[in-house]
């Protein structure tokens, strides 16, 4: 542990962290469109449908507005690999920046822990919107002392995936309610709601 925390090792890890992050973004973002990457093919199908549409691009504010506006724009003016590269940059880059803000020069090891999670790759190539939204929300939480930035990032995250509204709501509650017993009661209530109408809630999200 001592060698990991040495100044020389920390500097080296920081350098390798940047290089490894860039390589990983390129590797994930420039992947081929294949069924081996889960919903990548479904996103590609929607992308090509938009690319072949004759309707002019117009900004929409409904649903997951940010993600689909970006997809529509890239479908008309760029290509799918550049779009997936942007998605990977947001997904991985937000996590990288969040770890840097939390752990400063010692971010490399925590960042590697995130990359080693079994869900990491899946959220990057399969549940793309989920991964991007969650990463932006994690980054937003590092700006808790700068509310305008935090709120702005939360708005962008929710514009990528609607499930982020749940996390934003939970974060808002912790801002005002400090008594942990209320959270226990809320958790028990959520179990009941999930049992009663969980299917309808999941379908909406």
What spans do the regions from the language model cover?
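Start-transfer (signal-anchor) and selected internal transmembrane alpha helices
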Residues: 1-24
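Alpha-helical transmembrane segments and terminal signal-anchor/GPI-anchor hydrophobic tails
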Residues: 41-44, 171-205
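Short hydrophobic/aromatic helix or loop-helix immediately within or flanking a transmembrane segment
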Residues: 41-52, 56-78
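Transmembrane-helix motifs of polytopic, lipid-linked glycan transferases
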Residues: 86-103
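Transmembrane-helix signature of polytopic, membrane-embedded enzymes
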Residues: 99-117
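Short acidic/glycine- and proline-prone juxtamembrane loop motifs at membrane-interface regions
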Residues: 124-131
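Membrane-interface transmembrane helices that cradle and orient dolichyl/undecaprenyl
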Residues: 137-149
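Membrane-interface alpha helices of multi-pass inner-membrane proteins
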Residues: 149-173
């Amino acid at each position: 542990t001592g060698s990991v925390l040495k100044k020389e090792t920390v500097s080296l890890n920081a350098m390798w962290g940047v290089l490894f992050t860039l390589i990983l973004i390129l590797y994930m973002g420039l992947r081929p469109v294949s069924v081996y990457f889960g919903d990548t093919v479904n996103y590609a199908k929607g992308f090509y449908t938009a690319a072949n549409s004759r309707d002019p691009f117009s900004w929409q504010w409904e649903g997951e507005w940010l993600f689909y506006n970006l997809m529509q724009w890239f479908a008309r003016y760029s290509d799918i690999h550049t779009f997936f590269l942007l998605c990977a940059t947001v997904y991985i880059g937000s996590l990288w920046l969040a770890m840097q803000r939390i752990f400063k020069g010692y971010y490399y090891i925590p960042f590697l822990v995130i990359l080693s999670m079994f869900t990491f790759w899946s959220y990057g190539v399969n549940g793309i919107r989920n991964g991007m939204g969650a990463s932006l929300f994690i980054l937003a939480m590092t700006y808790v002392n700068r509310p305008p930035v935090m709120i702005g990032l939360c708005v962008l995250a929710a514009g990528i995936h609607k499930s982020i509204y749940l996390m934003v709501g939970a974060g808002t509650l912790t801002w005002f309610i400090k008594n942990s017993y209320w959270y226990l009661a809320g958790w028990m209530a959520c179990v009941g709601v999930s049992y009663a109408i969980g299917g309808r809630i999941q379908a909406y999200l």
